């Protein structure tokens, strides 16, 4: 797809919209660590249960990565990110209303699915809408946003807990996600590939898997990221 470089002011605002979504993704990813004492008391959870809650997020997140690539190429970040974030709202509200460990776990999986496009969606858009000299900077800033989400999942959440409780914190997050969806639908550009026909032959997963360089990076990514998590 040909580049469609956006004016700098519009590009900055688009980055802000995408960054808000990725911030929420990071916040939801790490928040269970802060809430673990409360969840343990309220639901009589074990250490294994808490581990499963963290793993449920990654299960939902990872399960979407392969279909996500096709969906982003075909429909673009605007439709995909906003659609997936609707699932995140469902998962967040379900977590806030959960009455059992199974309810918490299912909600975490839904949240993982819902925020799974919050990084790859923006990176797909930046590739087309941002000039080459801004690509590395935009990627680095997205990682900074990730760290900010982790930070806000600690002390700010602890400050809010005695004020509104953990269930209402998730309700507030659901409202923030809804605002991000509206901003995405209003301001993210339309994906040019949507108006093209199906004559162009797209690559298959077998093409990717048959690439020797790709296969050589799998162990590095698997153990390196797994160790970090």
Where do the PLM segments sit?
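Paired small-residue
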Residues: 91, 102-110
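Juxtamembrane intracellular "pre-TM" segments in multi-pass secondary transporters
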Residues: 2-7, 191-218
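Helix-loop-helix hairpin linking two adjacent transmembrane segments in secondary transporters
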Residues: 141-188
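Conserved MFS/SLC helix-loop-helix module at the cytosolic interface between two early adjacent transmembrane helices
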Residues: 63-99
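Extracytoplasmic
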Residues: 14-45
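Cytoplasmic helix-loop-helix junction between adjacent transmembrane helices
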Residues: 107-145
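Residue-level signature of mid-helix packing/kink "hotspots" within the transmembrane helices
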Residues: 30, 58-66, 150-151
């Amino acid at each position: 797809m040909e580049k469609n470089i956006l004016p700098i002011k519009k590009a900055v605002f688009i980055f802000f919209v995408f960054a808000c979504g990725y911030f929420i993704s990071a916040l939801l990813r790490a928040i269970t660590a802060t809430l673990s004492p409360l969840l343990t008391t309220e639901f009589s959870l074990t250490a294994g249960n808490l581990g499963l809650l963290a793993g449920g997020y990654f299960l939902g997140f990872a399960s979407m990565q392969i279909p996500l690539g096709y969906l982003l190429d075909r429909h673009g970040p605007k439709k995909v990110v906003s659609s997936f974030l609707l699932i995140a709202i469902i998962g967040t509200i379900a977590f806030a209303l959960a009455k059992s460990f199974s309810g918490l776990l299912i909600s975490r999986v839904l949240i993982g699915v819902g925020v799974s496009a919050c990084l790859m969606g923006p990176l797909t858009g930046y590739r087309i809408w941002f000039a080459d000299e801004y690509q590395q900077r935009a990627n680095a800033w997205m990682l900074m946003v990730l760290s900010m989400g982790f930070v806000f999942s600690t002390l700010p959440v602890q400050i809010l807990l005695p004020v509104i409780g953990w269930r209402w914190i998730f309700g507030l997050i659901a409202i923030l996600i809804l605002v991000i969806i509206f901003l995405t639908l209003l301001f993210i550009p339309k994906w040019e590939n949507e108006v093209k026909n199906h004559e162009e032959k797209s690559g298959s997963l077998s093409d990717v898997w048959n690439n020797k360089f790709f296969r050589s990076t799998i162990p590095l990514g698997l153990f390196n990221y797994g160790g970090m998590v």
